[in-house]
Amino acid sequence: MLRQIKVAVLFVLVAFSLMMEGTPDANADSKLPDPIKAGVAEKLFRLDCGRSLANDESVWTPGENAGRSIEFSSTCWLIKHGSEWLLWDAGVPEAALNDPRGWSTLPKLIVYHLDKTLTDQLAEIGLKPRDIARVAISHTHGDHIGNVGLFPNSTILMQQAEYSWIHSLNGPNDDVNQLMALARKLLGTPKNLQLIDGDTDVFGDGSVTLISTPGHTPGHQSLLVHLKNSGFIILSGDVVHSEENFEKNIVPSLNTNKTESIASMEKIRQLIAIYKATLFINHDKKQTDKLKLLPAFYD
């Protein structure tokens, strides 16, 4: 039995080493956690941060489903680590709650609606926006940073590549230019902005790790969370929009780089294999509807 355990541990370590060599960002200074020694976060809450209806699914599945409508979920996640709280993504702006027309990043394509504000959901577990120490954003599309302004004193974590991109002159087309302009408006000039480069261990113990997954946008990132009972969970951001897209390597037409998008999906597959992780896909409504919702949590 002892020999079997040693062999199993050796297999994990070898596989981890191979993954580190093969991932897009792999280098000697990688911040990916040791799958055996990683610390744990205490709780992971899902918040409902909006829902949307798009009028042409083929934007997300090029060559298929032209003219077919599709509904997406938008999810924020709240992580308790010791006495500190970290929010992952900030969702659709709270102002959308009282607008029957909804809110949009690209009005000709998609409309978002909100059923409950982020502030009200935090209040359900006794928190206020000022209690959130850090806000990490997957990328700067408006449905992910719509409420960053609620957290003026929080540290905002984002990739340097993402920040530089939205402040560059032009994107590849008018739709992307519109998304970039909205991002600059919603993000503003955070008082406490922490720009990072590549994979980053947020708390220094391997419990919460920002994973560089460019392609959807130049500085897109995902999040790897380690919990005591639930194990490793990957929060996708928009590295993938549905299980089908993930299985087939389908790259949405609004992504800024197809090659990077496919490489990032492969990186996520490698992480799933090494950490035996569960992938929560932000916009996949079928999956999201089955997940626990605050005040319930994963631990």
Where are these regions (language model features)?
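Bacterial N-terminal signal peptides that target proteins for export
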Residues: 1-9
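Metallo-beta-lactamase
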Residues: 7, 20-131, 160-212, 260-276, ...
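Bacterial N-terminal signal peptides
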Residues: 9-19
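Core dinuclear metal-dependent hydrolase active-site scaffold
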Residues: 46, 69, 76-80, 86, ...
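Active-site metal-binding loops of divalent metal-dependent hydrolases
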Residues: 49-50, 90-92, 140, 161, ...
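Active-site metal-binding motif and surrounding structural segment of the metallo-beta-lactamase
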Residues: 100-158
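Cap/insert and terminal regions of metallo-dependent hydrolase folds
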Residues: 109-120, 222-224, 229-299
